Curated annotation (Swiss-Prot):
Spans annotated as G3: 234-237
Protein known as: Translation initiation factor IF-2, mitochondrial
Pfam families registered for this protein in UniProt: EF-G_D2, GTP_EFTU, IF-2
Lineage: Eukaryota, Metazoa, Chordata, Craniata, Vertebrata
Tissue-specific expression: Expressed in all tissues examined. Highest level in skeletal muscle.
G4 as annotated region, ranges: 288-291
Gene: MTIF2
């Protein structure tokens, strides 16, 4: 009885091995059919090439494999004793590794991995060399191979100790001292923001900056006659303010919203209001350009009601101050309103302990090197302090104020320029003081490590999604081609893949004619960020693709020119230079370099470049117009030709031009004339007031009295992009 049960068990094992070998053979046959048979398997080659496979050959192969398994099982105890005396090979593995990577780590071929997975629940038919394996299957393969696994450093490092630097807990209220308010001037383009600041700080910034539009963020400390101080931030279209808010930087205490009394509420006015509300910052309304005859401050206040900005005149809490930045009228009232609101907010800070602040701007200065403009929010900054901002650090070499004057200390709410940075941090990054340079490196290394870990997690998610897509595609393919023989199935799959082959270079060039690749270079980090935010609003990809190849801070370099040549792109520079050597190199390579000092001029240039990539549009320009007074027909050969008797009302009719026939305002025919006569004479031009007879190239056209004949010419004009960036 026991022998019969043993035989039955052996038969069941044989049946399982037979099915698994059949699946594995199909995989090997398909791979060998694609790439040619390996000389390492000459016997298999003869068996696999013959189709269909003889049953006795497959059965023999299965029996041979089964005998081998039985022999190994019988020799198990002796084999295990022998293997225990030898050290096991250690294989370094990681999560998400592919079959090919696992085989390479084990120093085996991929077939070895497939065979190790035969007696598992995994669907071998769905696996390819680049398929990613779960942790359980990696362990299964390593165990069956008699090897030891070792997880790579990527997994072990997850328990690494946190070395980051963070802000200190809130200080004891008794230690806090009053500080100056930090005010951001916001509003629509050319509503007078820079001119307003110019009057406050008694400089000529607005006169220097072409067009009166702010070129990049500046931070300025303004001392009022009363002794109070206000720190102003000047933003370029408030794009950088939005970016700072997105990073969680709460720098601004008060927003002064500048609205022109003659223009009223505009698009960027609404955006400014939304930014202030999102940051939960109170607003003071400055109604500018009140010196103009068409100024209407009350209209501005009423328009703002629609955006939940209610001035004190209408029962709200928003102070409204009518001013003229050009003449300086009522500016002190605006300053007093700002100071009064700051007193109500009770702004205080701790001037002691390690420094905390926020990066306002980053740029490269030829004389000073890497420089950041920052607002100090806590502590007192001194020369020699070691700072960390994002993944950058600095040992402060030099500090200077908004006028370039060297200073020894910077207190809370004070804007300061800082040199000594190893790399440039981005606008909005948090600045923290640490005790030493080694500690700064430790913090930066930790933040870079965290970024790598986050990227690794994102990559794993992408891998998992692709794996899921691959599995679904494989399942659909099995449902679609499962009933076919493997050869027919492979041919159909090949034909499908052939349709997805990338375009040839010539075809790609034709397609890329409707693509504009750009490289952006700016003088400071905020300028570049503001331009990038404008480019983010591009919504006309159906007309022309806009691709950002590279962006950075500093003058145009040889690398920028090489990139532009590679991608057939255009270099846009903002407040930067391109040396003679660079310009000569660009000219030889056919690369356009466009330098601007006004941000909206750069955007207009970009719009023109996009428009130049669009196909030309055709416009009709009328030359003359005639009305039909009578209709008749003439006989030419054996057919009757309809003729219209007309009188020219406007311009002139020229036979070589194009014509159209309109009836009740609708065009019913377009084409050319076959005949144009005055009395019985053939003529080429009929002028205003003259009568004529004409026939069309459409024989079946029936004229009606009152129809109009329009003579016109077609002109090709350059199409314009539909993208409206809001300037």
């Amino acid at each position: 009885m026991n022998q019969k049960l043993l035989k039955l068990e052996n038969l069941l094992r044989f049946h399982t091995i037979y099915r698994q070998l059949h699946s594995l053979c199909q995989r090997r046959a398909l791979r060998q059919w694609r790439h040619g048979f390996s000389s390492a398997y000459p016997v298999w080659t003869a068996q696999l090439c013959a189709w269909p496979w003889p049953t006795d050959v497959l059965t023999g192969a299965a029996l041979s494999q089964y005998r081998l398994l039985v022999t190994k099982k019988e020799e198990g105890p002796w084999k295990s004793q022998l293997s225990s005396t030898k050290s096991k090979k250690v294989v370094e593995v990681w999560i998400g590794m592919t079959i090919e990577e696992l085989a390479r780590a084990m120093e085996k071929n991929t077939d070895y991995v497939y065979e190790a997975l035969l007696n598992t629940d995994i669907d071998i038919d769905s696996l390819e060399a680049d398929s990613h394996l779960d942790e359980v299957w990696i362990k299964e393969v390593i165990t069956k191979a008699g090897m030891k696994l070792k997880w790579s450093k990527l997994k072990q490092d997850k328990v690494r100790k946190n070395k980051d630097a963070v802000r200190r807990p809130q200080a004891d209220p008794a230690l806090l001292t009053p500080r100056s308010p930090v005010v951001t001037i916001m509003g629509h383009v050319d509503h007078g923001k820079t001119t307003l600041l110019d009057k406050f700080r008694k400089t000529q910034v607005a006169a220097v900056e072409t067009g009166g539009i702010t070129q990049h963020i500046g931070a300025f400390l303004v001392s009022l006659p009363s002794g109070e101080k206000i720190t102003f931030l000047d933003t370029p279209g408030h794009a950088a303010f939005s970016a700072m808010r997105a990073r969680g930087a709460q720098v601004t205490d008060i927003v002064v919203l500048v609205v022109a009394a003659d223009d009223g509420v505009m698009k960027q006015t609404v955006e400014s209001i939304q930014h202030a509300k999102d940051a939960q910052v109170p607003i003071i309304l400055a109604v500018n350009k009140c010196d103009k005859a068409e100024a209407d401050p009350e209209k501005v206040k009423k328009e703002l009601l629609a955006y939940d900005v209610v001035c004190e005149d209408y029962g709200g809490d928003v102070q409204a101050v009518p001013v003229s930045a050009l003449t300086g009228d009522n500016l002190m009232a605006l300053a007093e309103a700002t100071v009064a609101l700051a007193e109500m907010l009770e702004l205080k800070a701790d001037p002691n302990g390690p420094v905390e602040g926020t990066v306002i701007e980053s740029f490269t200065d030829k004389g000073r090197g890497l420089v950041t403009t920052a607002i100090i929010q806590r502590g007192t900054l001194r020369k020699g302090s070691v700072l960390v901002a994002g993944k950058c650090w600095a040992k402060v070499r030099l500090m200077f104020d908004e006028n370039g004057k060297t200073i020894d200390e910077a207190y809370p709410s004070m804007p300061v320029g800082i040199t000594g940075w190893r790399d440039l941090p981005s606008a909005g990054e948090e600045i923290l003081e640490v005790e030493s340079e080694p500690r700064a490196r430790e913090v930066v290394d930790w933040r870079k490590y965290e970024q790598e870990q986050e990227k690794g997690q994102e990559d794993l998610k992408i891998i998992e999604e692709k794996r899921k897509e691959h599995k679904e595609a494989h399942q659909k393919a099995r449902e679609k081609y499962g009933h076919l023989l493997w050869k027919k199935r492979s041919i159909l799959r090949f034909l499908e893949r052939k349709e997805q082959i990338p375009l040839k270079p010539k075809e790609k060039r034709e397609r890329d004619s409707n693509v504009l690749s750009v490289i952006i270079k700016g003088d400071v980090d905020g300028s570049v960020e503001a331009i990038l935010n404008i480019i983010d609003t591009y919504d006309a990809s159906h007309e022309c693709e806009l691709e950002l190849v590279h962006f950075g801070v500093g003058d145009v370099s040889a690398n920028d020119v090489n990139l532009a040549e590679t991608f057939d792109g255009v270099i846009y520079g903002f407040n930067v230079n391109a040396g003679n050597v660079i310009q000569q190199s660009a000219a030889k390579k056919g690369v356009k370099i466009k330098l601007h000092k006004i941000i909206y001029r750069l955007v207009e240039d970009l719009q023109e470049e996009l428009s130049s990539r669009l196909p030309c549009a055709v416009e009709e320009h009328p030359v003359g117009e005639a009305s039909i007074l009578a209709t008749f027909s003439v006989t030419e050969g054996k057919k009757k030709v309809p003729v219209a008797g007309c009188r020219v009302q406007k311009g002139q009719l020229e036979k070589q031009k194009k014509f159209k026939l309109t009836r009740n305002g609708h065009v019913i025919w377009k084409g050319s004339l076959t005949s144009l006569k005055h009395h019985k004479d053939d003529i080429s031009i009929v002028k205003t007031g003259m009568d004529c007879g004409l026939s069309l190239d459409e024989d079946n056209m029936e004229f009606q009295v009152g129809d109009r004949i329009v003579c016109y010419e077609e002109k090709q004009i350059q199409a314009k992009t539909s993208w409206d960036p809001g300037f």
